[in-house]
Design a protein with these regions (language model features):
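Flexible, solvent-exposed loop/hinge segments and secondary-structure transition points
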Residues: 2-233
Length: 233
């Protein structure tokens, strides 16, 4: 009887110890996973804003570069900066502003929407003038390799650089991914990029959700353009 009680007690203690150990390990792995995801996001933001180097960044370099150059601005749906985030705030959007020597060098916003096979996630960067494209990047998608998956290739992303988000009247028109190639004689060429052969649905999806996301931030960037215009006088 005593032997049975000892066995039960011993087994219970070992089970509890192993359970606590596994729980602690799982918590540690989750924390590390969350940290890696946060660093990957920061790396993508830095990259789309033009921060690059020949060798891969270490985690410490990513964090240091981000802390030194990127500030997060939260705005409401009318483009006003939210100084203190209210838990009851219905809508808020985040802008990642890059600066060097107290001078704004660009803005990045998160973008996401449906491609052919699922949701595409990325970041879109805008020059300090709030109307010229600085860059675009995608970090997660389910598009077909060799077709829609070309969205994360340099040749496609580079097509966006220098394009204009607004027309001559200063109105947001966004960027359209067309089928085929953009003609130099097209008056709307500044607002269009070459499409991906065989991936029309991916391009159409990108065109749609990019404009939708930009419209959320337009009240803020319209104010930036107004300030820039006044300062240039």
């Amino acid at each position: 009887m005593r032997s049975d009680l000892y066995t039960i007690a011993f087994t219970t203690i070992i089970t509890v110890i192993l359970g606590l150990g596994l729980s602690a390990t799982a918590d540690s792995l989750r924390e590390r996973q969350v940290l890696n995801e946060e660093l990957d996001i920061k790396k993508n933001i830095l990259s789309v804003l033009g921060y690059k180097q020949d060798t891969p960044w270490t985690n410490e370099e990513v964090q240091s570069l981000y802390d030194a150059n990127i500030s997060e601005i939260r705005i409401d749906e009318v483009g006003s900066v939210i100084e203190e985030l209210d838990k009851n705030e219905d809508v808020s959007y985040t802008i990642y502003q890059s600066s060097e020597n107290d001078k704004v060098t660009g803005y990045a916003i998160p973008i996401a929407g449906k491609g052919l096979w699922g949701t595409m996630y990325g970041y879109f960067a805008i020059e300090p003038d709030a109307e010229t494209v600085k860059g675009i990047t995608f970090y997660k998608h389910k598009e077909t390799p060799g077709l829609g998956a070309e969205v994360d290739k340099d040749w496609f992303k580079n097509n966006f650089v220098g394009k204009k988000l607004t027309n001559k009247n200063g109105e947001l028109v966004s960027i359209e991914v067309i089928k085929g190639y953009v003609s130099d004689t097209d008056p709307d060429a500044p607002h269009k990029v070459d499409g991906i052969s065989g991936a029309t649905i991916t391009g159409t999806g990108l065109t749609t959700f990019l404009k939708s996301d930009l419209q959320k931030y337009e009240p803020y960037f319209a104010k930036v353009r107004s300030v820039n215009q006044i300062e240039s006088l």
